[in-house]
Amino acid sequence: MESREAEASRSKEEETLSPAALLFHAPHFNCHIIAVMGCKIPIDPTIVKLGLEHTLIKHPRFSSKLVIKSRKMKWTPTTVNVQDHVIVPNLDNKIESPNQFIEDYISHLTTIPMDSSKPLWELHLLNLKSSYAEAIGIFKIHHSIGDGASLMSLLLACTRKTSDPEALPTIPMQKRASASNSSTASASASASASSNGLQKLFWNIFMILKLVWNTLVDLILFVSTILFLKDTKTPFKGESGVDLKPKRFVYRSVSLDDIKLVKNKMNMTINDVILGITQAGLSRYLNHQFGKNEKDGDRKHKKISLQKSIRLRATVLVNLRPVVGIQTLAELMGKESKGKWGWGNSIGYIMVPFTIALQDDPLDYIRKAKATIDRKKLSLEAIFTFQIAKLVIMTFGHKMGNCR
């Protein structure tokens, strides 16, 4: 009798995977999130395990395993043994190239499938001094557990300030225009609106029409890309079967202070600056690749043709949640958090075109990036792509949703 009651209670706690979570379990699309964090001091695995037991393990997604019942994937609560999830390899501190070793370790980690008999997450602790940290922690989390916004908020909710062990960390709010400028602009706008309400009405109608037009164009381009519209063949475009080959994580550190300096001077966002830097790097690299065998006299012509012939785009995931910021750990643990805050995978897709061209003024890369991002902000592409993907998965299944 007791076993039946326990089984009934467990069934009530089970939760069917959402369409977005199912997509990340589709064949050829088994996605994981790899997060690397550096520490200024060596990591004590005992303290880490103790902290996980009081924080991360309490979240339903990190204490549930994936089971298939009646041909449906479900999250089923289970007893978590932290020892099975925290991996501490024995390392030789005399490794000649620690940075290279860490890159190889992470790359190898992406080739190992996760054990579905336990919750789909792991934490690897590497007490190995590198050029950027005394020790490294590597999270490997299946994407069906949650997206980046969910996981970052949960991670921050599990931490506390060093100055106040009981307080959550604070995140600087986005800077707006100064109070005086805002007041002046507001007063000017109010005067203009009161003196010419018809002009304001026409402006609102124009912005709505622009939103509809941008959304329609973006959706047509999105569908066209799925069907026939491909990027130009460049060194960045992978060949068929590239998704099955081992991956390597290569990165470079940049100064956030430098990015903030450009951002503040040009009155832009960090995303604008980063996209501009990316466009500059891609343009210069492609020009070097395509023009490396040309003579100096012909190189200028090659640069001009580069500006007009390259189609290069990136798929960017966009957080669709209306609420932003750090949620308390208690809120993230509650059942109502799923509906109120949207734990899981609430992300849409947008296609961002790169402007591949050589600019005489380096700041032009950032100006063009801002124009691209501002154009994308005035579009509902992310919301529509999310809903379309959800509809396809619910109608035809997650395997069809992953058709390439």
Tell me what each language-model feature is.
Residues 2-14, 25, 34-404:
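Soluble acyl-CoA-dependent acyltransferase catalytic core bearing the H(X)4D motif
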